[in-house]
C-alpha cells in the first residue's frame, strides 16, 4: 500500500474535471530513494568484473589471450609489494589484490580500502610503460567502485576520475574498456558523481568509441556507461550533456544486439522521466516509432524499458501523446495489457491511464484500437498493482470522455469489476473508483438514465459495497460514499427506482418505463 505522501502526490497529479491540462497527466512516483539492486527486468546500476579459477588475461604486448598464474598473497604482503618500488613486485601484488577483489562472493573491498591501497592503484593507472600493471590496477578499482556509495567515494576521492577518463584513449583496447567499465560504476552511484564525470568532460571521448570497428562486447560496456550518464534525477543530467549523447543513442537504437538495445532503451527512459521539455528532446529525434517497434519484442529486457519510455512520453502534452498514438502505441497496448508478466500489464495500464487523460479524440482512438475490452479484463482478473493502474485509466477516461464514450465503456462491462474493487484496503484507490462511479452517474444523468444506472449498480452488489464504505476509517472515503448515496440512492430517487423495479420476463429482466421508449436506454 502506498505511503500517504506517495498517494497524495499521485492524487495531486491526477486528472480532475476543470483542472489545467498540465495537471491532467500523472508522473511515475518513485517510492525508493535507495540504490536498487539488479533485478531481472531492471537495469543494473553497477557491475563487478569477476574472475574464474582458470584465468585468461589479454596480454597487451602479445595481443593474445594468455593463461596466467596469480600469486596468493596476504594483505600485508600485497601492501608491501605495491609500495616496494620494484616493477615485478608491484605487478604481482596488484594482481593478487585484483584477484581478491574479483572473488564471486564477499570480496574484501573494505580491507583493501582500509589498507590505504587506492592512491597506489590510481597511481598505477598512469604507468603507460607498463600496460599490464595499468590493466590490473584498473580492474581492481573497477571492482571497488562497484560496491557501496562509500566504497565508490573512496575511489573518487583517490583521484580516479581524471585518471580513468585519460585511459579511455589508451591504445590498448582492454585497458580502455576497463576504464569505461569503471566510469560506468562511478556514474551509476548517483547524480553527484554522474555530474562530476560530465564536468570532467567524459562524454566526448566516450562518443568517439561508438563506431563500426568497436568490438561488440566493448560496445555493450560503452552503451551501459552512457545510459548511467543519463540516469538519476534530483538533479537531472544537464541538458547540454543530454544533447551531446542523444545523437549516438539514436544510432544505437538501430543496433540488433539485445543488450545494446536494452541499455539504450533504459537511457531513453531516464531522459523522458522529467519535464515536458525533456520529453520533447526525445520525441524530436523521431525515435518514437522505433520505441514502439521494440514494444513488440519477446525479450523482456527490451520490452520493459521501451514500454517505460513510451509511458513517460504520454505523461507529456497532448501533442507529445499524439506523437506516440500516431506511431502506433494503441495497437501494441492490447497485447501488453494481457501479457503474462504482471509488471508489463501494470506498465501498459499506466501508459493507457495517461492516454485516457487526454481529450475526447484521443479517447476515441483508444476505443477504435479495441482497448476497452482488455482494460475491463484487467480490472476483472489482473494483478492488483495492474488493477490499480486500470482504475486510474477508467477514472481518467470517464473524466474526459464524452457521454457516448462513457456509455461504450459501461457497455463493455466496466461497472462490475469496478464495484468489486471497492472492498480493497487501499483508501486512495477506493476514492479513485468512487470518482469514476460519480463520473458514470453524471453521464447517465445527461441521458436521463440515472434510475436505470441505480438499478444496475444495486443488481451488481454495488450499493451494498458503497453503503459499507460509510463506516470506513478514512474520512474522505466516508464522505465520497455518503455523497453518492445521498445524491442517487435516497429520497425521490429511491421512490423512482422502486417504480422501475424490474419484472422477471421469460428470459430477461424487463423494466416498467412510463412515458419513455425502451430503445432510448443505452446502459
From Swiss-Prot:
The keyword Transport applies. It is essential for selective protein import into nucleus. Promotes signal-dependent binding of karyophilic proteins to the nuclear envelope. Residues 7-22 have a biased composition (Basic and acidic residues). Belongs to the importin alpha family. The gene is kpna2. PROSITE patterns: ARM_REPEAT, IBB. It comes from Xenopus laevis (African clawed frog). One of its GO terms (cellular component) is nucleus. ARM repeats lie at residues 109-151, 152-196, 197-235, 236-280, 281-320, 321-362, 363-402, 403-447. GO terms for molecular function: nuclear import signal receptor activity; nuclear localization sequence binding. The lineage of its organism: Eukaryota, Metazoa, Chordata, Craniata, Vertebrata. GO terms for biological process: NLS-bearing protein import into nucleus. It is found in: Cytoplasm. Forms a complex with importin subunit beta-1. The keyword Cytoplasm applies. This is Importin subunit alpha-1. Residues 1-22 are annotated as: Disordered. Its main location: cytoplasm. Gene3D superfamilies: Importin-alpha, importin-beta-binding domain, Leucine-rich Repeat Variant. Keywords: Cytoplasm, Protein transport, Repeat, Transport. PANTHER family: IMPORTIN ALPHA (PTHR23316). Residues 2-57 form the IBB domain.
Amino acid at each position: 500500500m502506498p505511503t500517504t505522501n506517495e498517494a497524495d502526490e499521485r492524487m495531486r497529479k491526477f486528472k480532475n474535471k476543470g483542472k489545467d491540462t498540465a495537471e491532467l497527466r500523472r508522473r511515475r512516483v518513485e517510492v525508493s530513494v535507495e540504490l536498487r539492486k539488479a533485478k531481472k527486468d531492471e537495469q543494473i546500476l553497477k557491475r563487478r568484473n569477476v574472475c574464474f579459477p582458470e584465468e585468461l588475461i589479454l596480454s597487451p604486448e602479445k595481443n593474445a589471450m594468455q593463461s596466467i598464474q596469480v600469486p596468493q598473497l596476504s594483505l600485508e604482503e600485497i601492501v608491501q609489494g605495491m609500495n616496494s618500488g620494484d616493477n615485478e613486485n608491484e605487478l604481482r601484488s596488484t594482481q593478487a589484490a585484483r584477484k581478491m577483489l574479483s572473488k564471486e562472493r564477499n570480496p574484501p573491498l573494505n580491507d583493501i580500502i582500509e589498507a590505504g591501497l587506492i592512491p597506489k592503484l590510481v597511481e598505477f593507472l598512469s604507468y603507460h610503460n607498463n600496460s599490464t600493471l595499468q590493466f590490473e590496477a584498473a580492474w581492481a578499482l573497477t571492482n571497488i567502485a562497484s560496491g557501496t556509495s562509500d566504497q565508490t567515494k573512496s575511489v573518487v576521492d583517490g583521484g580516479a576520475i581524471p585518471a580513468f577518463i585519460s585511459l579511455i584513449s589508451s591504445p590498448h583496447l582492454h585497458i580502455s574498456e576497463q576504464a569505461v567499465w569503471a566510469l560506468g560504476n562511478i556514474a551509476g552511484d548517483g547524480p553527484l558523481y554522474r555530474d562530476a564525470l560530465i564536468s570532467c568532460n567524459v562524454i566526448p571521448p566516450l562518443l568517439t568509441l561508438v563506431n563500426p570497428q568497436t568490438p561488440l562486447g566493448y560496445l555493450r560496456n560503452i552503451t551501459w556507461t552512457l545510459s548511467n550518464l543519463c540516469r538519476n534525477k534530483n538533479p537531472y543530467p544537464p541538458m547540454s550533456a543530454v544533447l551531446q549523447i542523444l545523437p549516438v543513442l539514436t544510432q544505437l537504437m538501430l543496433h540488433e544486439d539485445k543488450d545494446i538495445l536494452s541499455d539504450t532503451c533504459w537511457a531513453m527512459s531516464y531522459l523522458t522521466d522529467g519535464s515536458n521539455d525533456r520529453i520533447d528532446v526525445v520525441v524530436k529525434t523521431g525515435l518514437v516509432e522505433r520505441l514502439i517497434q521494440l514494444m513488440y519484442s519477446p525479450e523482456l529486457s527490451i520490452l520493459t524499458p521501451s514500454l517505460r519510455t513510451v509511458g513517460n512520453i504520454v505523461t507529456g502534452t497532448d501533442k507529445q501523446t499524439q506523437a506516440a498514438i500516431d506511431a502506433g502505441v494503441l495497437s501494441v497496448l492490447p497485447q501488453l495489457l494481457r501479457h503474462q508478466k504482471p509488471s508489463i500489464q501494470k506498465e501498459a495500464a499506466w501508459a493507457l491511464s495517461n492516454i485516457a487523460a487526454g481529450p475526447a479524440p484521443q479517447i476515441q482512438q483508444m476505443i477504435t484500437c479495441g482497448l476497452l475490452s482488455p482494460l475491463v479484463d484487467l480490472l476483472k482478473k489482473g494483478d492488483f498493482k495492474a488493477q490499480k493502474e486500470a482504475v486510474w485509466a477508467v477514472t481518467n477516461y470517464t473524466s474526459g470522455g464524452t457521454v457516448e464514450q462513457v456509455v461504450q465503456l459501461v457497455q463493455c462491462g466496466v461497472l462490475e469489476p469496478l464495484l468489486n474493487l471497492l472492498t480493497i484496503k487501499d483508501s486512495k484507490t477506493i476514492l479513485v473508483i468512487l470518482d469514476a462511479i460519480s463520473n458514470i452517474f453524471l453521464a447517465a444523468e445527461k441521458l436521463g438514465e440515472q434510475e436505470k444506472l441505480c438499478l444496475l449498480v444495486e443488481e451488481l452488489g454495488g450499493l451494498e459495497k458503497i453503503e459499507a464504505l460509510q463506516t470506513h476509517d478514512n474520512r474522505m472515503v466516508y464522505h465520497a460514499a455518503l455523497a453518492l448515496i445521498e445524491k442517487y440512492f435516497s429520497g425521490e430517487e429511491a421512490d423512482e427506482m422502486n417504480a422501475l423495479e424490474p419484472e422477471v420476463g421469460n428470459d430477461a429482466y424487463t423494466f416498467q418505463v412510463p412515458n419513455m421508449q425502451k430503445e432510448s436506454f443505452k446502459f
